[in-house]
Amino acid sequence: MKTDTPSLEIPQAARLRRRQLIRQLLERDKTPLAILFMAAVVGTLVGLAAVAFDKGVSWLQNQRMGALVHTADNYPLLLTVAFLCSAVLAMFGYFLVRKYAPEAGGSGIPEIEGALEDQRPVRWWRVLPVKFFGGLGTLGGGMVLGREGPTVQIGGNIGRMVLDIFRLKGDEARHTLLATGAAAGLAAAFNAPLAGILFIIEEMRPQFRYTLISIKAVFIGVIMSTIMYRIFNHEVALIDVGKLSDAPLNTLWLYLILGIIFGIFGPIFNKWVLGMQDLLHRVHGGNITKWVIMGGAIGGLCGLLGFVAPATSGGGFNLIPIATAGNFSMGMLVFIFVARVITTLLCFSSGAPGGIFAPMLALGTVLGTAFGMVAVELFPQYHLEAGTFAIAGMGALLAASIRAPLTGIILVLEMTDNYQLILPMIITGLGATLLAQFTGGKPLYSAILARTLAKQEAEQLARSKAASASENT
């Protein structure tokens, strides 16, 4: 009797193929999979840190304003308490930065860009506590700073921390988790996941190494950080300006003019920031005592303004819906714009731990609203709404200053939930970016990073000369 050998060979061959496939999977390099898993861990931690930072800033601001209520009957005492509360909080932030982690000063975004190029160190064990608590002091004191700078730098440092703790090896893992943390930090700061992704791809395009693994990791990190944010803050737009009307096609040329205005102002604003940095450095001369006292004076000034003219202090998120609704006169808009330009320059250029995204969004809103009010008066036949120009202006200053128009556009759309205004926003942002580029202005973060690297090189050269001199003696 013959045996049916082919029927027995087929299952055996299938089992051999399965075993070979399993062996190949086990022998394959696990680094890409590990990076993606760690990206989820980084995104989760960054989201939780951003929520804690946001809640902490809000709590400090509420406590500070609550302390003023007890002195409401005594106006001189009220002003004194307003100044001192903000000054003390600001001095705390300045002291932490100067004493323990100077790289935690300012926005922190240029530091992440430098780290992605392996030109700046990432000392997460110092930067994380200093940036977190120092930022609580300066932002809680009412200084004109944004929360996105701290969350981006905290996010990048969390990425490096996770890398070190789990001992992942290789340049790809180090670079990818650093970028993932930064993107997750921006997404959690503004509840804007797509803007967080575009921020890495567009703003950090010279430093970001685009690979399938790196971009997937950024996506995963941003998703997890946004989920963490929405668990604690609900799924609502960060800035509630209501649903604005669409912009008719025959009015789009006005948005191009608005973009040209921002294209002129953006490079000028960048020069003012760098010039103010030089001026304030001459004031304190690198002395920690003078620097902390100077920071306390700036913080105290913001505290006074927060009581006397609230629209001129703070990050600006409370100002944006009020300005967009048209609740300010033209004269008041001009005053707010000038005052916020001055306070933004003082706060950001002094090296306080805090970002500049939010203050620039507020400045763009105020200038856009003022332009819209003029357009409404000059062209009544168009039935214009000044608020649409305010929304277009929000992202235009970002586009002109840091040269990231896509990030600015998507960020504003996600924050305000007015997607019908995407066309006028593109026109405004494109006009602002092109003119700023043609005038030769350098992107703000690139200019700050170049200064930091030049200072670092000078310090290294001075140390090497001192070491050589000591050896010769």
UniProtKB/Swiss-Prot annotation:
Lineage of the species this protein comes from: Bacteria, Pseudomonadati, Pseudomonadota, Gammaproteobacteria, Enterobacterales
Recorded GO CC terms: plasma membrane
Site (Mediates proton transfer from the protein to the inner aqueous phase) residue list: 203
Intramembrane region spans per record: 109-116, 177-189, 193-201, 387-401, 402-404, 405-416, 417-421
Span of the annotated motif Selectivity filter part_1: 106-110
Alphabetical list of NCBIfam families matching this protein: PRK05277.1
Descriptive protein name: H(+)/Cl(-) exchange transporter ClcA
Renumbered ranges of motif Selectivity filter part_3: 355-359
First-listed, main subcellular location of the protein, grouped into a coarse class: membrane
Motif stretch (Selectivity filter part_2): 146-150
Cytoplasmic compartment segments: 1-32, 117-123, 167-176, 202-214, 282-287, 439-473
